[in-house]
Amino acid sequence: MIRKDAKRSALVLFSGGQDSATCLAWALERYETVETLGFDYGQRHRVELECREGFRNAVVRAFPAWADRLGEDHMIDLSVLGAISDTAMTREIEIEATANGLPNTFVPGRNLMFMTIAAAIAYRRGLQVLVGGMCETDFSGYPDCRDDTMKALQVALNLGMDTRFLLETPLMWLDKADTWRLAHELGGAELVELVRVETHTCYLGERAELHAWGFGCGECPACRLRKRGYEAYLAGENVTEPV
């Protein structure tokens, strides 16, 4: 059962990927008005960003009740983040572990910047809730995806803007199988199919072949995690071991 809070409005960090798409559905089921926010920070491909409009349009067609709640979409040019980053998310380099144990897909400061800009937009537009797809269960060790980070950031943003934002991370303690299950709980098989077909997770931007779990190369860490989570969801299992 999803608790509804119809008097509140939310801004969802929406990249066009599976996690943020599920968070968007979660917010649409919960809040009266929901706006979306994406960032172009010089990613190595634009496939995920290009999925954003298609998923939003598909949700409007498939779920009329949500269509009335879905508000404006915002796209922010954050190319400065790509300019100061040297990662596999912003450069054509092999995906591998670095000396500190983190994969080189980690973009330092990314979620901190995303949430800070989201808060500034929400402040201007009178939105009370910020929603992000950060997760500490199925993740690669990114420090800016941790629950402690998000809680500390909520405090800092509220102090710095003298407001009472609520930072919601509905996937924080879910594995990928649970994320597929949440989509089913929110919108049934139709939403699961929209997430499968209309979103993109692959680090390499491969969208030539539609697999059972969605589009992707099938080999990068993001694809393997998505694939394994989908298979576990179909089998009714949990997936908590690292890929």
Curated annotation (Swiss-Prot):
Listed pathway(s): Purine metabolism; 7-cyano-7-deazaguanine biosynthesis
GO MF annotation list: ATP binding; ligase activity, forming carbon-nitrogen bonds; zinc ion binding
Keywords: ATP-binding, Ligase, Metal-binding, Nucleotide-binding, Queuosine biosynthesis, Zinc
GO biological process: queuosine biosynthetic process
Cofactor(s) demanded: Zn(2+)
Domain of life of the native organism: Bacteria
Name recorded for this polypeptide: 7-cyano-7-deazaguanine synthase
